[in-house]
Amino acid sequence: MAPPPPSPPAVSLKVLLLLLRVLTGVFLVIALIILSTNSVTIVSQGSALKFHFKDVYAYRYMLSAAVIGLVYAVIQLFFTISEFATGVKNPFNYQLDFYGDKLISYLVATGSAAGFGVTKDLKDTFLALVALDSTDPVDKFFSKGYASASLLLFAFICLAVLSVFSSFAMAKRN
């Protein structure tokens, strides 16, 4: 026998959780695209130096955090859609939600913080060496670093809200 249909507040909460999972994935995908395509060519004294995001360790960490977060978001999106369609939640999903949301949210938050920190430090160092204006390609490189870090921050906010809901669900379950 099928479970009774959920009450309207439970449906709207499930829709909110689904929306937050989708937003998390979207923020992480856009951050990945911006970060992975971030490069600049610096011409100095007749020689050109190609500088990629992967030349900065903190940007690599950001990329790793975004990839791991995206994999988790896709897995959770699958489970959320499955639960939404069937109306039944696997007991294992409570623990996955509880621990996974917390772990991945902190990973994404530290990726964002690393991105903001290294971008500011590198930009300040570069400004001390060379006059930089907003049309300079190097400034665009740093702006993309800030954009990626901002998107990771937005993904963290979504994951933090999801973490609060998963804490309530875990407490309610026990």
Curated annotation (Swiss-Prot):
PANTHER family: CASP-LIKE PROTEIN 4A4, CASP-LIKE PROTEIN 4D2. It is found in: Cell membrane. Residues 1-14, 82-97, 172-174 are cytoplasmic. GO terms for cellular component: plasma membrane. Homodimer and heterodimers. The chain crosses the membrane at residues 15-35, 61-81, 98-118, 151-171. Keywords: Cell membrane, Membrane, Transmembrane, Transmembrane helix. Disulfide bonds: none annotated. The keyword Transmembrane helix applies. Pfam families: CASP_dom. This is CASP-like protein 4D2.
